[in-house]
Amino acid sequence: MLIDSYGRVVDYLRVSVTERCNFRCRYCMPDEPFKDAGHSNVLSYEEMFEFIKICLDNGVKKIRLTGGEPLVRKGVENFVAMINGYKSGLDLAMTTNGYFLAKKAQALKDAGLKRINISLDTLDKTKAHFIARKDVLDNVIEGIETACNLGFGVKINTVALKSVNDNELIYLMDFAKEKGAQIRYIEFMENSHASSELQGLNKDQILDIISKKYNIKEITKSPNSPSSLFELEDGYKFGIIDPHKHDFCSTCNRLRLSAEGLLIPCLYYEDGKSIREAMRAGDIKKACEILNQVLADKPEKNKWENDGKGEISSRAFYQTGG
């Protein structure tokens, strides 16, 4: 069992299989040309898998594959099958922008993927182009529909932005309800790579918009979940991730592994420790030592103060795996 210095059980590993992404979303990617880590610096699937096995053997129960955009890396469905084949009953999930999902969903399902979180910030093609800096909406919608039809557990992630999609939040919920997916509204999280003109909506503002159509009640959430959970009168549940006022640091159960092998204890933590050389040398003992050191270094609370003006990591979310 993996336990940090504050007695929190860590049983959730987020693995960024690549920092590359085919979108350049304004709330995530920098304006300047993207420079990735380089092929030689990225862990192979086999190297990632060997580290994942260490974690699974020590009590990790949930693996989420992220990016960048995980579906731009070739062979990711084979990687899913490797992980799924190692431990039965594993909660194996992926976060994706959905662009390539329609083509790859069946292979991912066959490989053992259970759940998919898909980004959808608007149902308007012009706005989608503005946010992602390319035409993406048709592909994303097709990906969502395919995933829902195949029986994946689907969540739709929507970053709530003032003067961008604030007039669509109800429409997006209705879309998610129709598809049988849960929507989660995400407060815009300031980071050094986001466009400076963006402004987000907070939880109260989001609820105020939704309540114009629906009666809402807050319900008990999982203690490890980053989102507040709400229910409509018809039983439909939706979430709001509101780190500005309600972090979940006291129950945080996760570590993050970047594509280049950096093991990171917190999304807003600048530093981590690299397992790359240990994994390439096949030095499992050394990898375990690094894992234990990162557990010991896991902070009690993130460095981002509740007013959003605290120290913000210069590591972009696309590098850490959001």
UniProtKB/Swiss-Prot annotation:
Keyword Manganese assigned: no
Domain of life: Bacteria
This protein's pathway: Cofactor biosynthesis; molybdopterin biosynthesis
Ranges of residues in domain Radical SAM core: 5-217
Binding site for S-adenosyl-L-methionine: Y27, G68, S119, M189
Binding of GTP, residues: R14, R64, T95, K155, R254, L255, R256
PANTHER family in the cross-refs: MOLYBDENUM COFACTOR BIOSYNTHESIS PROTEIN 1, MOLYBDOPTERIN COFACTOR SYNTHESIS PROTEIN A
Protein name: GTP 3',8-cyclase
Organism: Campylobacter fetus subsp. fetus (strain 82-40)
